[in-house]
Amino acid sequence: DEAQFKECYDTCHKECSDKGNGFTFCEMKCDTDCSVKDVKEKLENYKPKN
């Protein structure tokens, strides 16, 4: 969901920047991390419950 992604991205980007990493590095890292997290959560929801 878009709001969750934005929250994940904003938090990640701030933490990444605070560590002294560059904007583009953080943008790519956080975009990937948060996209993967989003996909993972969706997959968890689709798994059949045994």
UniProtKB/Swiss-Prot annotation:
InterPro entries: Pollen_allergen_ole-e-6 (IPR015333), Pollen_allergen_ole-e-6_sf (IPR036466). Expressed in pollen. Transmembrane segments: none annotated. Disulfide bonds join 8-34, 12-30, 16-26. It comes from Olea europaea (Common olive). Keywords: Allergen, Disulfide bond. GO terms for molecular function: IgG binding. This is Major pollen allergen Ole e 6.
